[in-house]
């Protein structure tokens, strides 16, 4: 087992790793839309989702993986009415991936730092 961390993604907001690689799997901890340069949550739902995917890309790159390696996505969203907007951004992110990952989206009351969305990723080598 090895910890994956990069300065190109935000430091965790709690006592956990950005990601952990074990037995060919990469488990990326839930990401919220924090800009790693400022350490601040970006404003706006769309902007948060886009920032999350930038953070995911940075962690994947540090682990030597790409979007094509993502097999499972778990999304937590505080306003299920934004599901359609989420799907549009998500579809664009995975547009060049031939096999789309499995996914679940869960509506929740609130998230850390008042984020509107949090995304957790599982990838495989």
Curated annotation (Swiss-Prot):
PROSITE patterns given in the database record: UPF0076
Gene3D superfamilies tied to this protein: RutC-like (3.30.1330.40)
GO MF, any single term: deaminase activity
InterPro entries, sorted: RidA, RidA_CS, RutC-like_sf, YjgF/YER057c/UK114
GO cellular component, one term: cytosol
UniProt xrefs under Pfam families: Ribonuc_L-PSP (PF01042)
Protein family membership: Belongs to the RutC family.
Protein name, per record: RutC family protein aq_364
């Amino acid at each position: 087992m090895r910890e994956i961390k990069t300065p190109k993604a935000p430091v965790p907001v709690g006592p956990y790793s950005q990601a952990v690689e074990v037995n060919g799997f990469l488990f990326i901890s839930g990401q919220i839309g924090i800009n790693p340069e400022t350490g601040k949550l970006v404003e706006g739902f769309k902007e948060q989702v886009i920032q999350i995917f930038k953070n995911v890309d940075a962690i994947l790159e540090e682990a030597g993986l790409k979007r094509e390696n993502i097999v499972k996505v778990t999304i937590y969203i505080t306003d299920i009415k934004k599901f359609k907007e989420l799907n549009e951004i998500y579809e664009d992110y995975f547009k060049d991936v031939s096999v789309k990952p499995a996914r679940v989206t869960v509506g929740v009351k609130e998230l850390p730092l008042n984020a509107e969305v949090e995304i957790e990723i599982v990838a495989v080598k």
